[in-house]
Amino acid sequence: MKKYFVADFNVIDVPTGGGEWVDDFIIKKFNLEFLHTRNINSFDQTAFYVFSNISLLPQHLLNQIHSLNYVILEHDYKICLSRHPWRYQDNIIPQQERINYSLYKNAKAVFVQTTDHMNVYLKNDVEANFVNLECSIWSDEDLNMLENINNENTNKNGKYAVYFTNNWIKNTQGNLKYCAENKLQNYILKENRNRVEFLSNLAKCEGIVFFPLARETFCRLVVEAKCLGLNVITSKNYGALKFF
């Protein structure tokens, strides 16, 4: 049986994406063939599929998924067009705006990252075989890298990292404003295709300021910052409340 992993992007396309690193681990661990959504014209009814972020998949293809043999590795929410249930009161999507419910109901399993992540689905009456991972996923190689970088950066620079990105959800300008108002010297943490360099630059800092505008399902950056010995200034929106 052929085994495919389907997503809009992979870690080569988006080397700074936390979700893409999770996907990359799963692809390698289970020896899956990666398929970009943009390259899919039809599905193999005899194959097994893992679907990740598939917002770029045309609706007529989405409608065919329910008949396949598949699981979903979820990083956000596919039950409304914006993928942001937090925009609605109590995260409850109006009935007329709910989409893709059969996608979840017919999956062999739907892997979610936290209890909070799962509860948003349950509040919106989504039927599925949910499997709560209660965490993100790191490879042994990644964990060893974090440990080595932490050991090499015991002397902090006294600055607070602000992740500099065009992704509005990460709230770069708001984080810079917080630093200014609270007299914290900021360190601009630029996106970097080299993961070791990115985390090494983060590890030099005293802390990180991160107030995402959207409710994240699990912010790996915040957890990795904590692993690297940084003070973390954030809000409940970072999604990994069980950890600290």
PLM feature segments, named:
Residues F48-V50, I65-P94:
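Active-site proximal beta-strand in glycosyltransferases
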Residues K105-F130:
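A short, active-site helix/loop in glycosyltransferases that binds the activated sugar's phosphate group
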Residues Q89-V110, A203:
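Membrane-proximal helix-turn-helix segments that form the acceptor-binding/catalytic region
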Residues M1-H60, H66, C219, I233-A240, ...:
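N-terminal pre-catalytic "stem/leader" segment of glycosyltransferase-like enzymes
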Residues W138-F198:
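Conserved catalytic-core segment of nucleotide-activated headgroup transferases in glycan assembly
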Residues S55-L56, K78, D116-M118, G239:
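Alpha-helix capping/helix-boundary segments
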Residues A203-T217, L230-N231:
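Acidic donor-binding loop of glycosyltransferase active sites
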Residues L199, V222-L228:
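Short alpha-helical segment that forms part of, or immediately flanks, the ligand-binding pocket
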